[in-house]
Structure formats: structure tokens, C-alpha cells
């Protein structure tokens, strides 16, 4: 599906035959950074109900919204047609391999069976520790602390770009652990210059579908990885190289 300022163009689903499901990141699209518009949320729910299809909702960055409360999940609107999917890979660490599914009742047994056939274990100790982390309230406190830190970093990045690179535009809403910068100039050349300075930045070309034209130049920048002590230097190095 094409993606525009309103998110994924779910109206395209009506023109496709034999589609049993669709994967959406309704809370925060990567890498462009917008949520799925309310009209399109309603449209995709209507499509799933009419066709008996399933929406797989990846709650991407749902816990990291900085300007307002997180957008409600599609699953809350229609739990019979939406599989809600989340993970602790960003809030804690990807190496924990902890994630969760909230399934329609009819899918619980086949999904559990299929998971057992393809994966022997999911780390029982890690699951028990995560359960205790959640029940004790520690996970919620951790999320609040991380949200405040990442909000601060994003605000510093946005302010620095506005101050030093007026031809560069910060795209997307205040959420997640990355920003997409629309730049004046060649994204590949900028990505190479940033890589030379050991800054892990990717051009939009990495994410474009081969059938989609080159509409704009941009780079995707994650701001969560640098340590607290390294953040200021990393930000300064980035800003010096922006066109």
C-alpha cells in the first residue's frame, strides 16, 4: 500500500482479491512517522468486517508518544477482527525476545499450536521476570522515565535542526525513537558523510518500494542509541553535516 500524510492508503485493499489479512502500524508508521488517520482506521475496520479478514496491528512505538496520550489501538474498536501485537524490544532490549499477541478467540488455539511447532521456547525465566516487572508497577515507571528522556532528546534534535539547518524539515509526529529529516540535497551523499563520522543514519532509499518513484530526499535518524554521555557530541556531529 502507498503511504501519504494520512498513513497507509487502506482504500487500496478493496481492489485486491483473496486478501486474508493486512499488517498495519497504526500508531506510528516507520520511517515517515505519521499515525493512521481516523477515517482510514474506520475504513480498514469496515473492510475487515465486510471481508472476514484480519488486521494485524503492530503497536509500533505506541508507548513513546510525547505530545499527547497514545492513540487508541484498533484492537479496542474491533477485537474480533484485529490481532494486537507488541514487544519489549524498544522499551527494554531486543535480546530478551519478549513479545505478545492479543488474539480473537478463534485464533488462540491455532496460533499457540503453530508457535509450538516453530519455536521450542520463549525464555520462561524472562517471561516470569517481565510479568513481575509489570505487576509491580516497575515497568510503568521505567516507561515514564524513558519517555521523558527520549522526549528531551527529540526536542533538542528538532531545535538544533531548526536553528542550524533551516532547509531541513523534521517529518512525522512527536513519537518513537527516530525522526525522518527531509533534506535539500542528495540523501546518499549525506548518509555517506555521516557514516564516515561513525553516525548510524540511513537514507530513505533503503525503505522505498522499487516501484515507487524518488519523490524526496531524506534520512532516518535514531536518537535512542547514544549513551547519555555521548548524546550531545553525537547531536553536534550530526548538525554540522546537515545541508
Q: Could you say what each language-model-derived stretch is?
A:
Residues 195-220:
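Conserved PLP cofactor-binding pocket of PLP-dependent enzymes
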Residues 106-108, 128-145, 162-165:
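Amphipathic alpha-helix from the class-I
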Amino acid at each position: 500500500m502507498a503511504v501519504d500524510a494520512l498513513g497507509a492508503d487502506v482504500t487500496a485493499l478493496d481492489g485486491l482479491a483473496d486478501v486474508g489479512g493486512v499488517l498495519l502500524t497504526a500508531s506510528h508508521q516507520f520511517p515517515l512517522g505519521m499515525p493512521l488517520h481516523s477515517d482510514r482506521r474506520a475504513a480498514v475496520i469496515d473492510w475487515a468486517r465486510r471481508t472476514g479478514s484480519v488486521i494485524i496491528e503492530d503497536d509500533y512505538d505506541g508507548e513513546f508518544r510525547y505530545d499527547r496520550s497514545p492513540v487508541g489501538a484498533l484492537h479496542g474498536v474491533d477485537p474480533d477482527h484485529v490481532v494486537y501485537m507488541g514487544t519489549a524490544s524498544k522499551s527494554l532490549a531486543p535480546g530478551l525476545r519478549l513479545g505478545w499477541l492479543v488474539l480473537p478467540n478463534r485464533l488462540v488455539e491455532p496460533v499457540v499450536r503453530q508457535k509450538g511447532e516453530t519455536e521450542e521456547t520463549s525464555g520462561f525465566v524472562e517471561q516470569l521476570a517481565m510479568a513481575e516487572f509489570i505487576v509491580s508497577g516497575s515497568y510503568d515507571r521505567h516507561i515514564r522515565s524513558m519517555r521523558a528522556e527520549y522526549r528531551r532528546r527529540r526536542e533538542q534534535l528538532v531545535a538544533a535542526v531548526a536553528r542550524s539547518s533551516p532547509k531541513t524539515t523534521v517529518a512525522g509526529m512527536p513519537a518513537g525513537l527516530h525522526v525522518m529529516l527531509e533534506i535539500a540535497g542528495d540523501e546518499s551523499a549525506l548518509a555517506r558523510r555521516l557514516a564516515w563520522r561513525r553516525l548510524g543514519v540511513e537514507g530513505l532509499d533503503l525503505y522505498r518500494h522499487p516501484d515507487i518513484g524518488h519523490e524526496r530526499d531524506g534520512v532516518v535518524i535514531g536518537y535512542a542509541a547514544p549513551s547519555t554521555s555521548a548524546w550531545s557530541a553525537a547531536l553536534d556531529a550530526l548538525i554540522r553535516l546537515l545541508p
